[in-house]
Amino acid sequence: GEKFGKSIDGAITLDSEVTIPYKLFKYFFNSSDEEVMGYIKLFTDINPKDFEELNKATLESPYKREAQMYLAKEITKIVHGENGLNDAIRQTEGLNRGNWEILLDKDYEDLYRNSEKTSELKREKIENGITIQQLAVDYGLCNSLSESKRLINQGGISMNGQKIEDSNKEISIQDLKADKIIILSKGK
């Protein structure tokens, strides 16, 4: 249950009940080139020969992020087990590479539970009719309807990983993931 990181704000917890596999994996994958080998020495039981080979590969081709991948996989496996590691890899593939169709209902539930930015949307609001444009404003993604419409028209708003092309699109119950979650995101 100890916090790990430079500051409490950016820290993760090495507790499988608190930090989901995706967040733990992502945190260690984002380790800097300067820190990663020290973390590997500190947190894993890599043998000296493999450590030297990984260090050499990292120095020669840091852009491949082999050491970060090794660290992220090992720490996630230690904290969450093999199933947790598989969840983290699937969630990373789904969210970071736009491969949303591979995500499972449990992935959406994990991501929602561990998200810092969530809002509650009453089911009756969907049933009564709300457009994506209005939803983006009501839940703080955009400051105004005109900003929302402009972003949608420019391909800058996604719902559940799909770019929204029609600012008048009505949200429906079928848009809910795990029967209760909608993920709105801003940016191309």
Where are the language model's segments positioned?
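Conserved nucleotide- and phosphate/pyrophosphate-binding catalytic cores
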Residues: 2-188
